[in-house]
Amino acid sequence: MEVIDKFHSHDGEQLIVKHYSSSNKCEMKFSLFLPPASRSGKVPIIWYLSGLTCSHANVTEKGEYRQKASELGIAFICPDTSPRGENIPDEKDNWQFGSGAGFYVDATQDPYNQNYNMFSYVTDELPKLVFENFPVKEETQGIMGHSMGGHGALITCLLYTSDAADEVDG
């Protein structure tokens, strides 16, 4: 794991991190905003899943969540939407499949099942990495998303929350 970019915003730190993903068998990136409260202890975290054709960078660069996250003492993480790279199978003629379109599910068919395992990545591999390396609370987290990311957030909530009716707000 390597922090490849870092800047200060609203008294917190915005990080861009890359690491090797065993789920997707490639390098992945995510952005993580740590509020000032994280300097003195663990803070709650919100997972934001971006939509179709996006990456970790879209909401990091265009959305302004940092001021409110800083005020509330909440970390904010944005994983990439799919595996990327020259050796990753892709549907180059169809923007709805492949890079930028992982749909936060695990592929079941060759050749995609070797790399497109975004559900396992965002629900297992990435959380373990984040909880082991950053001052965030595993017991206090939320998830949301936009478009394809909303789908990913919804299926995650439905599969991992015992009383999803109280958790889902549409």
Annotate each language-model stretch with its function.
Residues 55-57:
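Conserved HGGG/HGGXW glycine-rich cap/lid loop of the alpha/beta-hydrolase fold
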Residues 135-146:
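Alpha/beta-hydrolase fold nucleophile elbow
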Residues 146-155:
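Glycine-rich nucleophile elbow surrounding the catalytic serine of serine-hydrolase chemistry
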Residues 62-109:
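Active-site machinery of serine-nucleophile hydrolases
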Residues 2-37:
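N-terminal cap/lid segment of alpha/beta-hydrolase-fold proteins
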Residues 42-51:
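Short beta-strand element of the alpha/beta-hydrolase
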Residues 160-165:
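Conserved small/polar residues in nucleotide/adenosyl-binding loops
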Residues 98-133:
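Alpha/beta-hydrolase active-site loop
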